[in-house]
Amino acid sequence: MEKKTLSDIATQGKRVLMRVDFNVPLDENKNITDDKRIVESLPSIRKVIEEGGRLILMSHLGRPKGKVNAEFSLAPVAARLSELLDCPVGMAKDCIGTEVMQQVLALQDGEVLLLENLRFHAEEEANDADFAKELASLGEIYVNDAFGTAHRAHASTEGITHYVQTAVAGFLIERELRYLGKALQEPERPFVAILGGSKISGKIDVLENLFKKVDTVLIGGAMVFTFFKAQGYEVGKSLVEESKIELALSILEQAKAKGIKLLLPTDVVVTAEISADAESSVASIADMPNNLIGVDIGPETAAAYRNEIIGARTVLWNGPMGVFELDNFATGTIAVAQALADATAQGATTIVGGGDSAAAIAKAGLASEITHISTGGGASLEFLEGKELPGIAALNN
């Protein structure tokens, strides 16, 4: 379903209430340690300011548990946003109430006001109707540009849309829908999905939905050991979800029945302990040492996976190939990241969904060489599972 976006509406002279994701990390001195999320929302913000709209921004930060807590104030965000925009950004003391309404009504064309943390009110996460209605009264147009919270039906993402006539997607959400949506609806083929991570249970719904769309699935991360155990291999001390062995077998059978090429590693990196200075070696799946742990895909597997990725026209990656947080076990994950960048250079559409894979791309220094890196962890996952995201479903068609 096509959604109306910020491009479809005129904001000049209008009060524009925009839900953004300013949930940024702060150090103990309230300094923002990574402003990526603020930077990502700038195109939508600038469009409203440049058109002469009166912009009211709202977001959550951290988990203040429905109470006012100065530690989670958005004041540092207002200061950083002001620097990035090179114009003043007003900071409200709350997100509802008479004083806030006065500040909103005093806004001139092209001015910006940031509301205080939505989650200082328990009503936000409870999707309370009265709270949503009060938020809605602040604006004449509602824009949602917070993909990271689109899978939650909260007052500022879903409830609010019942009390506004115009509810549209910002540029960030538009971009997510364009790339994730196209991959699931009408991908250019061959379509290769790479799934990693430690547990099959976390990826089963994604796998089952992707089986309706993909040509090839490459599997990495610790979840491979549950598949190997299901096939009767010894996996040493590697992580296995014993309760998911039947499920692993049924996934392999489903892939076969649907004519999907599903590849598992042929070799893995093994170690006695998971630490930054641990020794490691490569073992083939057929003879894994019984006292070691598998922590990454091996070089033979990395080369085979690269071939599949390079030959694809659409590539979707969710989840690392191993314990990539430690440099000594990051080789397989970095190799996959590089293969994605090379496929992109050859004209493929490459999409990275979820926090860990995005972190791996950043670690490899390849973020600018991928078509689209999704900004939502849980939201991307639910989208890939084929679920409807309440924050997006609620916007105008």
Curated annotation (Swiss-Prot):
Gene3D superfamilies hit by this protein: Phosphoglycerate kinase, N-terminal domain
Is DNA repair included in the keywords of this UniProt record?
no
InterPro entries named in the record = Phosphoglycerate_kinase (IPR001576), Phosphoglycerate_kinase_CS (IPR015911), Phosphoglycerate_kinase_N (IPR015824), Phosphoglycerate_kinase_sf (IPR036043)
Domain of life of the native organism: Bacteria
What keywords is this UniProt entry annotated with?
ATP-binding, Cytoplasm, Glycolysis, Kinase, Nucleotide-binding, Transferase
User: Which reaction(s) does the protein catalyse, per the Swiss-Prot or TrEMBL entry?
Assistant: (2R)-3-phosphoglycerate + ATP = (2R)-3-phospho-glyceroyl phosphate + ADP
Q: Which Pfam family name is an example for this entry?
A: PGK
Question: GO MF terms on file?
Answer: ADP binding; ATP binding; phosphoglycerate kinase activity
* Residues noted as binding ATP in the record, renumbered to the chain: K203, G294, E325, G354, G355, D356, S357
**EC number(s)?**
2.7.2.3
User: GO annotations under biological process?
Assistant: gluconeogenesis; glycolytic process
UniProt binding sites for substrate: D21, F22, N23, R37, H60, L61, G62, R63, R119, R152
Its family remark reads: Belongs to the phosphoglycerate kinase family.
Oligomer and partners? Monomer.
Protein name as it appears in the record: Phosphoglycerate kinase
The upper taxonomy is: Bacteria, Pseudomonadati, Chlorobiota, Chlorobiia, Chlorobiales
Gene field: pgk
